[in-house]
């Protein structure tokens, strides 16, 4: 599984449109995603203090768009991610049937995030 952090509003818009398109798809040519081990470092580095975020759990085999594993787009990984880790980048819109779960990304009083609980998914 791979994961993408977004706002509930963006996800609701995706459901209305029939596909999910992050702003980065237009500006960088791909949608940033993470492995489960990368989610918290990414969330706490780039989204600290932001409420109303959700986490999309995505099954790569169900994606219609191309998926590539690449170094972080900024060069060095965020603190907490080992040097050399590759990140999943989706080069196109995310088809909704590839999203297996949508869960709230909990926010602590200090502005840091916590990993949500996922339910098992049988494909």
Locations of regions flagged by a protein language model:
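Conserved, structured core segments of small domains
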Residues: 1-123
